[in-house]
């Protein structure tokens, strides 16, 4: 009884994986995923005039972006 339940469950999992793989090939999932990843990397490459969360800063200067403040103890931008 346990073996037959295990085989039935394994068969369902295999059916799901095969169906998902064939569907993702139709949608060109890998290409879409890679294009989205590279689009995010291009966005990160843009220079901005302020420093974001976790960036090093000098407490005396106002270098952090809005809604962030430079921690005098740790010397990095943190949320206010």
Swiss-Prot record:
Tell me yes or no: is Disulfide bond among this UniProt entry's keywords. yes
Q: Which domain of life is it from?
A: Eukaryota
List keywords of the entry alphabetically.
Answer: Amidation, Disulfide bond, Ion channel impairing toxin, Knottin, Neurotoxin, Presynaptic neurotoxin, Secreted, Signal, Toxin, Voltage-gated sodium channel impairing toxin
Protein location: Secreted
GO CC terms for this protein?
Answer: extracellular region; host cell presynaptic membrane
Q: Name one Pfam family in it.
A: Toxin_12
- According to the UniProt entry, the coiled-coil residues are none
Tissue specificity annotation: Expressed by the venom gland.
A GO MF term: toxin activity
Disulphides:
50-65, 57-70, 64-77
**Record's keyword annotation contains Signal:** yes
- Give the pro-peptide residues: 22-48
Q: Where is the signal peptide?
A: 1-21
State the domain notes.
The presence of a 'disulfide through disulfide knot' structurally defines this protein as a knottin.
**What does the function comment of this entry state?**
Lethal neurotoxin. Selectively blocks tetrodotoxin-sensitive voltage-gated sodium channels (Nav). Does not affect tetrodotoxin-resistant voltage-gated sodium channels or calcium channels.
Protein family (similarity comment): Belongs to the neurotoxin 10 (Hwtx-1) family. 51 (Hntx-8) subfamily.
Q: How does it assemble?
A: Monomer.
What is the protein's name according to its record? Answer: Mu-theraphotoxin-Hhn2q
Q: Which organism is it from?
A: Cyriopagopus hainanus (Chinese bird spider)
The organism's taxonomic lineage, starting at the top = Eukaryota, Metazoa, Ecdysozoa, Arthropoda, Chelicerata
